């Protein structure tokens, strides 16, 4: 927790010293962050489909894509996979996947991705089908070709350091210009679920640079929103097009953070008396879910507090279902029945109020966000025409 607090303070310091030559135009830095959660990625995918549909309707453009509206798109684990899908270009230099195609992707490939390998030793899944699909979909595309700034995290188990793949880092670290399928597999390679991923790129001197990577959640927790904001602020220092963040002016930043759902069952199921007798194996079965839920909650707490304190609470929206039950809590239940339930979770979430204190539904809030995104895109287009 202390590390996250220090990180947030650092972000504030960066924001406070960021110069702006573009803010007078009413620009906004727009950030989309997508959590990890395995097959539960169906939940944010359902939300993204709704948002992209709203943007298409508002702008009367059936070809409108999320990458056209967000300056930064960040994701961890399955969120990193979604990030790649909506930002990697196809042969026409447009995102290879529309938001409405993501849920069908899970239905088509999820059962084979999460098909147990049958091995007694090693991870639960061999990852071969996941890699095959990623190679087919993403091709030879590399980070520098992404249609907007991306933030995809992983963790190198050889160096014991997080690895953050972004376009803005490539000038100083060209070895990070990896293939998108390598990055997408790496950020999803959750320990015990999939094997770690080894691959090699080249440094500026042409030397080989090796990566030994696992799931990005190991490095940045399951909610990458803070990480995505830090990249956005660094961009603001370097590029006038992103320079509208100034002096803690969160009114110039729009952050949409999408969760993959958490469960409220922990406090109903476990007591201190019961857990006192647990072995290491018992803890291993539940600690990851507990950690993910707690870290996601705290990230949301820090961000919502910051935006509210800086009179910009309407510029941050966290879309999260906090009461998953039964099979929907699992990261790897890719049965058709469970995936249908996850779609229902996403659709029902749109009708729920944002919070107890805010009767606005997520659907209404997303429509409001879509209007801001649309207006901001038109503003930039008008400026470019002069």
Swiss-Prot record:
Name of this chain's protein: Patatin-17
SUPFAM superfamilies: FabD/lysophospholipase-like (SSF52151)
Motif GXSXG, residue range(s) on this chain: 75-79
Keywords: Coiled coil, Glycoprotein, Hydrolase, Lipid degradation, Lipid metabolism, Plant defense, Signal, Storage protein, Vacuole
Signal peptide annotation: 1-23
Ranges for domain PNPLA: 32-229
Residues annotated as the enzyme's active site: 77, 215
Glycosylated position list: 202
Effect of residue 77 to A/D/T/N/C: Loss of esterase activity and impaired insecticidal activity
Reported pH dependence: Optimum pH is 5-9.5.
Stretches assigned to coiled coil: 321-384
Lineage start: Eukaryota, Viridiplantae, Streptophyta, Embryophyta, Tracheophyta
